[in-house]
């Protein structure tokens, strides 16, 4: 446009602008913009729904997650008490909180005065009775139902009537946790994502008895924390982690079938994911998923299911925190390096399981991992766990690194056409069997009618 006359330049710029406007990337970004504003519309919750006072909080568990949640609440102006069962834990948590404030000052995000004000509202304790007067408690302890029930039972005895009891569980039943208290209506899931002070997503998980004003207050809290609160229903893993299991399942199977971890990761990263699944596993810690799977009783009858990750976790290869997981991390580096030992272990495991190894294309990696997400997302929508398909997109764009220009997994499926998606899923079922590739009825019906996931619930 700069090489022609002004009039011709305008004409050329308009031509290019229209190409951008009509592109799939533009559609995806516009969808993301409106989807993030739609999530606040929750059936039964409106401007008339009362909101409880939420000016003070307690956080149970002074690990990295708990300290990050405490810092987020302090930054939003709340008074915060951090509880842990050991002096060492509390000292570690305090140092994390102080370090986050100091980092904010160093980067020019906050002033010294703001840091001092924030820390003046911060206290630590090992005594549950010190939490008697807080407005909300956020539990962030180990992902074990027995441990969480013990914590909620203790809170139920000391926390004032009307306080909200929230759990940061990433997978466990809100209703089962709530049943350990005498006030299930006050219990809700607030699933923060790590690092809690940075990640924008907050999954707000309502139980069968969660009161409307508790949901409304949680949405208001999310906003005050600078997060996008997405209200979801109660099931294993809720929306995000339930879908992650399907995504991770396929990436794990691909390793046994012949794709190297770095090949899988690079393929999905190049497609647009913020990180590859194997790098994500090492970052989060392979022991986390391993322990969750050890507690589950409803895993598929398939010896290949997360076989590689569980094998590595069983060897103490947890990821970055141990210096080796799926990858090697030399001298404390966060940069993953392919490990020949892992390659040999995967080959031996595939041989033991009778899995024939072969060359796998980039297209197959993308298709199986992304369509695994879509199929699980369709089930979630069909079951009413998500209010609308765009809520699922918001979860995956803001919590799991799904490329924003693709608009989230459900929008991506709609953009392809659900008839084509259904056809592809049927092909995957023919090739790999029905265990993971049975099409949900919702997908079948929409494919036949020419509908979209976006139309569900309208």
Report each predicted region and the residues it spans.
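N-terminal glycine-rich phosphate-binding loop for ADP-containing cofactors
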Residues: 1-458
């Amino acid at each position: 446009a700069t090489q022609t006359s002004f009039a011709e330049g305008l004409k050329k710029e308009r031509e290019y602008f229209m190409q951008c406007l009509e592109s799939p990337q533009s559609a995806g970004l516009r969808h993301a913009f409106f989807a993030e504003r739609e999530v606040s519309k929750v059936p039964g919750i409106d401007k008339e729904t009362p909101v409880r006072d939420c000016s003070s909080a307690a956080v149970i568990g002074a690990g990295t997650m708990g300290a990050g949640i405490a810092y987020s609440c302090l930054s939003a102006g709340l008074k915060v008490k951090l509880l842990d069962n050991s002096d060492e834990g509390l000292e570690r948590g305090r140092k994390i909180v102080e370090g986050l404030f100091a980092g904010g000052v160093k980067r020019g995000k906050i002033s010294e005065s703001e840091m001092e004000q924030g820390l003046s509202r911060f206290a630590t304790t090992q005594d549950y009775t010190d939490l008697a007067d807080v407005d909300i408690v956020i539990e962030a302890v180990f992902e074990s139902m027995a441990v969480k029930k013990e914590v909620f039972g203790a809170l139920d005895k000391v926390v004032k009537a009307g306080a909200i009891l929230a759990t940061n569980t990433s997978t466990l039943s809100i209703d089962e946790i709530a049943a350990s208290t005498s006030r299930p209506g006050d219990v809700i899931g607030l699933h923060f994502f790590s690092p809690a002070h940075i990640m924008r997503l907050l999954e707000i998980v309502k139980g069968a008895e969660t009161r409307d004003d508790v949901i409304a207050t949680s949405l208001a809290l999310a906003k005050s924390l600078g997060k996008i609160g997405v209200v979801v229903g109660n099931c294993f893993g809720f929306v995000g982690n339930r879908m992650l299991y399907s995504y991770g399942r396929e990436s794990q199977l691909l390793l046994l079938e012949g794709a190297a971890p770095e090949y899988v990761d690079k393929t999905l990263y190049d497609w647009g994911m913020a990180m590859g699944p194997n790098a994500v596993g090492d970052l989060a810690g392979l022991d986390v998923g391993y322990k969750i799977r050890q507690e589950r009783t409803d895993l598929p009858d398939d010896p290949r299911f997360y076989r590689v990750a569980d094998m590595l976790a069983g060897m103490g290869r947890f990821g970055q925190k141990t210096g080796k997981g799926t990858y090697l991390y030399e001298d404390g580096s966060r940069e993953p390096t392919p490990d020949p030992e892992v390659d040999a272990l995967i080959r031996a495991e595939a041989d033991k399981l009778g899995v024939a190894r072969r060359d796998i294309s980039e297209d197959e990696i993308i298709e199986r991992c992304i369509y695994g997400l879509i199929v699980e997302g369709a089930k979630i929508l069909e079951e009413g766990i998500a209010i609308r398909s765009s809520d699922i997109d918001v979860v995956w764009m803001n919590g799991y690194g799904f490329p924003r220009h693709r608009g989230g997994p459900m929008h991506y499926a709609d953009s392809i056409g659900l008839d084509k998606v259904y056809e592809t899923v049927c092909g995957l079922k023919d090739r790999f069997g029905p265990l993971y590739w049975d099409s949900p009825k919702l997908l079948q019906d929409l494919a036949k009618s020419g509908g979209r996931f976006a139309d569900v619930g309208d």
